Amino acid sequence: KGYEPIVEIMIPLTVTREELALARGWVEEVLADINSRPVPKAKKGEKSIKRPKVSIGTMIETPRAALRADELAEVSDFFSCGTNDLTQMTFGFSRDDVESRMMPAYLEAGLLKRTPFETIDQNGVGELVFMAAERGRKVKRSLKLGVCGEHGGDPESIGMFYRAGLNYVSCSPYRVPIARLSAAQAVIGGAKT
């Protein structure tokens, strides 16, 4: 009571405008049904009940979605870059399969500087995030952009997300304090990392 919730419905793994438009239509049908019902009356002394505005967006978690972000933005209120899946699909390997054996060998041999599942690969996955942000905002200037996944709690990755123009990061609860600090440092310091 008394709160104004931010309601966002995120449609995962979309790869075409048509697919997202279809799924958005299903969500809008349900919302129209809900909105056609009477709003319960507020009790005496309480604020009147208002229906929250509902935003409908999609996850950018495949390379194709990043490449076609301009088309997806036409039918989306926001994007959330799902960097765990985007990293897997960009590198072509499963996080579960590589972290125990292959990744330590890659790091030891110097093939990668760090695991791309902890700190975003700025030259590959990061480029896709920049591309999605740029292409999406070219179509819809006010498009809300964010990231979800473990990268949302990594200081170096947060700096890159700030430079890409993302509005928010989300991460595991235990990473929230460092994410907040890193986001503030990115804003104050201009995100040079």
Give a label for each model feature.
Residues K1-T193:
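Conserved alpha/beta-domain cores
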